[in-house]
């Protein structure tokens, strides 16, 4: 079985000490053991947020030109953040109360909710050019006034498009509802799907994005360690574990915690992907799936399976070890294919046959997906379609890859997931929480 796919340069020995120092030649960002603090310092160049903002916008505008887009109109909160680096809480992400216009050339314009939100944006975003933060016009839930308000929103967008002289060009949209679509098309705009350009930009990470993903993975690893060695005990409820993870990860710098899946005993088969108030019993297998937004908006999403009592010496049964090895081996077989020049087909061929094959749809269980400032960035891999429609894997993509022993009639089962950077030399596993020792022998 594979245990680590970190691949550095050829061995390089320091003649004075005999130590292998090859890791010093590799990029800092590619090494999960070399991590910057979340804070800033005068003596070390850590995450450079000005560079992060500029490189994200540059990548996005380059992809827009590939698709011949004069501008993008963004409604999804994560896309607005990617383009403008504005953030005012996760609650605003997907309710269409703010938007941004990004021209293929020039500075983006942010439309922020009026009132104190608008005032805060003008204070918090000095990198936005003067006049490029404006009041958003909301239209959803405007009972009796939806067409009127959507029309005003469209007018505000058109004003920016005319300022950049792109109103006659193709305008990409990432996500919108029917009233907004109708209002924009009523102005004669050539509306096209803008998501492919956004996706291509976001799935390939910048150096600073990789450093932030590394920070997020370190917080997730620490939370998993706490679960295994401190919190997981007979008589504890699944939701108690979830609550402790929330508190711990927020204290360590996460912005927001999504649902933490804690499935124990019979809740692992069939697998219930949420936590309940069920008591965890000694000997239960416990699947924990951590989904959280780490420092500056970058995700951690990974899974471990524990044995309740394992930290106190209770061993897995031979059947449980076999299931764990099955999942581990299929996951790492897929990980080994995450290298530049391969395709998504190379990865999913290593996944077990499952309901993705049976129903030709994604179960999100034998699966890999790009992660970044959202849990699902832009590339999913599944046996449902990836073998027939392969997509290229590129350097600096970052994936969560997960497999599952989803056999029928099991009393309990296992599931695992890792977070992996695609480096020039192959896959680098960023999630470092150890696996069950007896299953690794």
Q: What are the functions of these language-model segments?
A:
Residues 1-441:
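Active-site neighborhoods and metal-handling regions in enzymes and metal-associated proteins
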């Amino acid at each position: 079985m594979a245990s680590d796919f970190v691949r550095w340069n050829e061995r390089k020995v320091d003649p004075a000490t005999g130590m292998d120092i090859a890791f010093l030649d590799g990029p800092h960002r590619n090494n999960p053991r070399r991590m910057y603090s979340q804070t800033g310092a005068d003596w070390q160049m850590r995450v450079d947020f000005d560079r992060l903002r500029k490189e994200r916008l540059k990548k996005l505008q380059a992809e827009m030109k590939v698709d011949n887009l004069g501008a993008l109109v963004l409604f999804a909160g994560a896309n607005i953040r990617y383009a403008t680096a504005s953030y005012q809480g996760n609650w605003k992400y997907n309710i269409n109360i703010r938007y941004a216009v990004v021209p293929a050339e020039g500075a983006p314009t942010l439309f922020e909710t009026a009132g104190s939100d608008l005032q805060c944006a003008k204070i918090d975003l000095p990198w936005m050019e003067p006049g490029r933060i404006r009041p958003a016009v909301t239209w959803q839930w405007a009972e009796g006034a939806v067409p009127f308000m959507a029309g005003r929103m469209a007018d505000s967008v058109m004003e920016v498009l005319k300022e950049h002289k792109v109103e006659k060009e193709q305008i990409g949209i990432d996500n919108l509802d029917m009233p907004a679509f109708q209002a924009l098309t009523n102005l004669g705009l050539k509306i096209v799907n803008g998501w492919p350009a956004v996706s291509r930009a976001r799935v390939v990470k910048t150096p600073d994005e990789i450093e932030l993903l590394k920070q997020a993975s370190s917080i997730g690893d620490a939370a998993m360690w706490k679960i295994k060695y401190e919190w997981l005990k007979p008589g504890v409820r699944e939701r108690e574990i979830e609550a402790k993870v929330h508190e711990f990860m927020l204290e360590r710098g996460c912005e927001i915690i999504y649902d933490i899946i804690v499935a124990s005993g019979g809740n692992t088969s069939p697998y219930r992907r949420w936590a309940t108030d069920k008591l965890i019993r000694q000997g239960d297998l416990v699947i924990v799936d951590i989904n959280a937004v780490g420092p500056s908006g970058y995700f951690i999403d990974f899974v471990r399976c524990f044995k309740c009592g394992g930290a106190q010496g209770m061993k897995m049964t031979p059947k449980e070890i076999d299931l764990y090895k099955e999942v581990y081996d299929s996951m790492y077989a897929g990980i080994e294919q995450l290298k530049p020049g391969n395709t998504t087909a190379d990865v999913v061929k290593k996944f077990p046959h499952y309901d993705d094959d049976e129903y030709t749809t994604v179960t999100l269980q034998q699966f890999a997906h790009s992660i970044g400032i959202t849990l699902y960035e832009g590339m999913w891999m599944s046996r449902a379609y990836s073998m027939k429609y392969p997509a290229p894997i590129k350097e600096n993509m970052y994936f969560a890859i997960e497999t599952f022993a989803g056999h029928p009639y099991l009393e309990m089962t296992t599931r695992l997931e890792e977070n992996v950077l695609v480096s020039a030399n192959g896959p680098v596993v960023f999630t470092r929480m150890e696996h069950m020792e007896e299953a690794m022998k």
